[in-house]
Amino acid sequence: MKKKVLAAFLMAAMTISMVGCSKPADTKTSETKSASKTSASATSTASSTASASKTSSVANTEQAVEKTVVAAMPGKWSDLYPMGEDSHYDNIIFDQVYDSLVKLNGDGSYQGEIAESWEVNKESTELTFKLRSGIKWHNGDEFSANDIVESFKIYSNPDIKTTSRYYLRYLDGCDEGGVETKKGSIGVTAKGDNEVVFKFKKPTFVDTVLDDLSHVYIVEGTKLKDKSAEELGKAETWAKPNGTGAFIYDSMVDGERVEFKANKEYYNGAPDFDKLVIRVVDSANILAGLMNGEIDTVLYGGVPLDDFKLAKEQENLVTESVKSQGYQLLIFNCAKKYMSEKVRQALSMAIDRKSLVEQLLQGEGEPIITPISSINPYYNPDVKVWYDVNQAKKQLEEAKFPFDKTLKFYVPTGNSMREKAAAIIAENLKAVGVKTEIVQVDFPAFMEAAKKGDEDLGIVGSGGSLNPSESSEMLTGAFNLCKIEENNKLIKLLKKGDSLLTMEERKPVFDEFQVEMKKISPYGYLFTTNSLVAYNKRLSGVKPENFSTFNWEIHTWKVSE
């Protein structure tokens, strides 16, 4: 039986390798394809790329073989605009080229990236970063503290298109959305060439600010500050990304792969290998690629659950299941007239989360009812996961739910686990009389539909956070996909918790937040998913425990051929 399964995967890989390449396209205007077609083409294209890279034919026998790492992700990135990331797929691309001040580890601690160290003042109103030395931009320009200052001025400019402005909301001189209150008012100043000071509006828990700053990519602000908002919004401005990161952008085939060269002058230690290729590979094809060596690891989404047992049996792979904050959630479009609080509660309690975890995840996860899971120090054990079909039916009837209506249920393609979860949820809802039509689109199209409010329901994943206040990102601003009223009770509780400076003060407030989150149900939180990590044994120095916080540190990996 095992041989048949192995043969099936190898046949899949061979079939994929025979598919032709698609042409490169403009990063902003190319037509998106279905994830399965994209990944099949990507597998073919990058198969030859990886093979050629790993076996680099050389005319001179003394020339060293080029070392290449090929990493996969199951979804397509949006574009190369680092201030407007829409998904973790975008983050995977940007994270190679650009750096942030700090990075979050899986255990909740922070490590410096551009920052060598940091210190908060006694009043917790200022945070001073000392910067590392030897930092250079990929174009050879010297890096300075002023690049950070100008980067944050760009992010806070209301005319600039950015989804990262939200992370500036605690800074002095910015409003609640992170917008500067007047031109250049943001409280970020350089102290010489090697220090930057961040001033807060009021005393703030320092980990909250560090968490936000870990999401902000530093761009070459001193060069970009004089460009207009229109220029900064053009794809050609970012066609050749210039960062300080461990990898230098080389080329891409839109929707299929991005290739990078190692930054041999990287201030945090040059990569051990020469080239990094990030490929879009449908989750159904990931194990085949790992088994035959076409891909070395998966950066987001991990190995599909159905394939993990077989992955663990492969002699060429290292595997690990790691608990994570990452979760899946159901989007309820609160802007729809029928989608009242009572209806949202009913739809949420109609979902059998325990069965989803046991049957779909084979126990590699945990049912949740809020974004705060049991491994989070802020977890409230008194807020129980619900499942009550009879009560769900009763509440729908009491709310006069339009049972004759078919709800559009948007599902992004490329993640087989999520697609299967959506099908099961549709059956759960059918059991309480709710009709759905599943609409499958690629991830960028899904995000566009969700932001416009085209959907009735949607399913999406989040990396989660140990910091409860990050939940506000999905309740206000660009990522308020549920379209809930902005000034809601949940936001008020999060702000209250944020205003407190000790764990002892904050915990009761975030306990109440979880109670209210279940009651208001703007989203139907479903389950956490363990990170099912697999990587080729030729790699060492990989830290699976940090994958859930998107801190891959690829430049620290070692490669043996």
Where are these regions (language model features)?
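Surface-exposed binding/hinge segments that line
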Residues: 166-224
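Detector for C-terminal structural segments
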Residues: 350-378, 417-424, 449-561
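Ligand-site clamp/hinge motif
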Residues: 235, 263-308
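Gly/Pro-rich hinge or "lid" segments in bacterial periplasmic/extracellular proteins
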Residues: 199-200, 204, 212-271, 275
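Aromatic- and charge-enriched surface segment that lines or borders ligand/interaction sites
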Residues: 116-164
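Append "and occasionally in soluble cytosolic enzymes with long acidic Gly/Pro-rich linkers
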Residues: 339-427, 432, 512
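N-terminal lobe/hinge region of extracytoplasmic solute-binding protein
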Residues: 72-122, 153, 242
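Ligand/substrate-recognition segments at binding pockets and active sites
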Residues: 254, 399-464, 503, 531
